[in-house]
Swiss-Prot record:
Source organism (scientific name): Mycoplasmopsis pulmonis (strain UAB CTIP) (Mycoplasma pulmonis)
Cellular compartments annotated: Cytoplasm
GO cellular component assignments: cytosol
Taxonomic placement: Bacteria, Bacillati, Mycoplasmatota, Mycoplasmoidales, Metamycoplasmataceae
Name of a matching Pfam family: tRNA-synt_1b
GO molecular function per UniProt: ATP binding; tryptophan-tRNA ligase activity
Binding site for L-tryptophan: 140
Motif 'HIGH' region, chain ranges: 12-20
Protein name: Tryptophan--tRNA ligase
């Protein structure tokens, strides 16, 4: 039976967090035996932000090494750098001409991010890449014609646009693009800030105390858990009215490979101090082991990214050439 294909990328801005691991990377590791997987470091997407070249280079290698340390197997998963596969840019140009300015300017993420780019004199200089970002994302996806694309809630609208573009190409040019779906894991789909558990833990946030970074001192991470916001009830159970406690239970369940029900059972007669100690120790142990693996994998990042580039380019080139033949810019 042919395996289905999964594609996902992560921008090379900011430092990876525990939320990135639990919400995404952990699931990729579980799915790599079931799917043909293409996982990439989205360095081109990072260019819509202000960048420091030396920091960007460091982030790219760091993210790739962390993916490997978390358990991605380069024999099973194609791990590559987006900019290494030139087909992404050409595919974007083709897809850009299948969309309208109206469609792109209605994207919620564009409206949110562009509203924050205002100078002191009340003028704006919004990068055009911010507007066209969803078409590069669509190119990233359709080049590998996947069945499944795990995305966060903030990217669901972009995935819907990708599905719309695929449908349009299929109807217009008789192409065979899949309309990929996404999935949401049962536990840990969204890990929240430790200081404000109504907001997502994010690698782009300034909320340092509410965020656990995968490469930070495990002892510091333990202390952050100990100081995390809960509530005044002092009873441990998972409930929407208890976002802080629920968040800690989800972190524990995911790191210890237990169900939420099992996690609640473990802490049902415990107080919040005991809950935080249990979760804190789980986080500290996880980070200690992960960081040891990270050091081992960092040395082979360049080699693995180069191998991934070759494998990804083979698939991307094949699918792009087929599309170019269909639209008339390649001979059949």
């Amino acid at each position: 039976m042919n395996k289905k294909t999964l594609v996902s990328g992560i921008t090379s801005t900011g430092k990876l967090t525990l939320g990135n691991y639990i919400g995404a990377i952990r699931n990729f590791v579980k799915l790599q035996d079931e799917f043909n997987m293409f996982i990439f470091v989205a360095d081109l997407h990072s260019l819509t932000n202000e960048i420091v070249p030396s920091v960007l280079r460091k982030n790219i290698k760091e993210i790739a090494a962390l993916y490997l340390a978390c358990g991605l197997d380069p024999e099973k998963t194609v791990l590559f750098k987006q900019s290494d596969v030139y087909e992404h840019g050409l595919m974007q140009w083709i897809l850009l001409n299948q969309t309208t300015i109206g469609e792109l300017s209605r994207m919620t993420q564009f409206k949110d991010k562009s509203s924050k780019i205002t100078h002191a004199n009340n003028t704006e200089s919004i990068p055009s890449g911010l507007l066209t970002y969803p078409t590069l994302m669509a190119a990233d996806i359709l080049l590998y014609n996947p069945n499944l694309v795990p995305v966060g809630q903030d990217q669901v609208q972009h995935l819907e646009l990708t599905r719309k573009i695929a449908r349009k190409l299929n109807n217009k040019y008789n192409t065979k693009f899949n309309e990929p779906t996404t999935f949401v894991p049962e536990t840990g789909a969204k890990i929240m800030s430790l200081t404000n558990p109504t907001k997502k833990m994010s690698k782009s946030s300034d909320d340092i105390n509410g965020t656990i970074f995968l490469l930070e001192d495990p002892e510091l991470a333990y202390k952050k858990i100990k100081k995390s916001i809960t509530d005044s009830e002092n009873k441990v159970y998972h409930d929407p009215s208890k976002p802080g406690v629920s968040n800690l239970l989800e972190i524990y369940a995911c790191l210890e490979n237990k169900s939420l029900k099992e996690a609640q059972e473990i802490f049902k007669d415990k107080n919040y101090l005991e809950l935080k100690e249990g979760v804190g120790n789980s986080v500290k142990n996880f980070l200690t082991k992960l960081q040891a693996k990270y050091q081992e994998n960092y040395k082979r990042v360049d080699e693995i990214l180069n191998q991934g580039k070759i494998k990804a380019q083979k698939v991307a080139s094949y699918n792009l050439n087929n599309l170019m033949k269909k639209i008339g810019i390649r001979d059949k």
